[in-house]
Structure formats: C-alpha cells, structure tokens
Amino acid sequence: MKYCNVLDKEDVKNKTVEALRRAKETDREYGFNFCSADGKVIATYVEGGKKDSVGMDNVCPIGAKVIGALHIHTRPSLSRDAIPSPTDIKKSVVENMDFFCIGTNVNNQGIVRCFGKDDLVSDMVHILRKDRKDKLEKLGIKIEDIDRSIDRSTRLMVGRMTVYKDYLDRHSCQRIFVG
C-alpha cells in the first residue's frame, strides 16, 4: 500500500487536519486532490462543499496529474468510520485515481482511511453487484442483505456497507489525527 506514505507527509498532514477541522466547524465536506509531477506527490488547496458532497474539481498545477483525492464525510450515517460511499467508489473508478481517502470526525479524533484502486475498488464494485453471490458467500455476507441494500437509497446502502468492515480493514490504511 505505497499510497499510505502520502498521509505521513507534513503538508498532507496539515491539509488533512485543516479539512477535518473545517468539516467539523461547518458540517460541510472538505477535501483536496493529490497530484503527481516529476515523481513528487503534492496536495492541492482544501476545497469546501455541501453537507453531503464536496464537488472538487479534478484540477492540478500545470504539468501534474490527479492521482488521488481525500475528502471528509460529515453525515451521521458515516461517522462511525471512514467508509467510502458507492458514489466515492464510482468517482474514483471513473476518474482513474490510483487511490482515494475518506475521513470523518469521531470523538475529537479525525480518522482518515485510504483505499488503492488495485486492492479494493475493483473488488468492491464486484461485491456490490448482485450476480457475485459466490464471492459474497466466501466473505460470509448474505445475498439478501445486498439485495435489500441495492433496492434502497444510497444512504441505506452506505449503512449496509458497515458489513464490509473486516474486508475494508484488510484493504486500506488508516491514520488518526487528534484535534
């Protein structure tokens, strides 16, 4: 999980803490992009959004390309853990990101969890499809739970994704920011 090291860079730590603080103060999502130029990873400025979306532009400095993104969830249904929503997964796939990070504030701690496209996204997309019963059974997940969640709203579906916590723990890295 080579992308985990990016969370330990001083400028990324500072921007992550800023995004966590601003999200907590305003109850709006905040985030930023990770860009790659000349073999270096840089973090863009922190952008603010709405209560349940950030709407970040896919922008980097001239000569750099977007390789990832980080944003902070504020909704109560996501506050138990930093778990990606189906929209987060879809966006990372469509925009061909190498990794993406989700954060949330819980008990005066900022939790940020990053996921790489190679070790999570393709598997998660398949898991969320009804026709992958064999893979679901291997993970000990009941197909009825998936059917129910697919037929309901995204918010309920995200709630059902907590079933995948063990799976997510094996396919992500996590950092705690005290604030």
At which residue positions do the language-model features occur?
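Short HxH-centered metal-ligating active-site micro-motif
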Residues: 40-98, 105
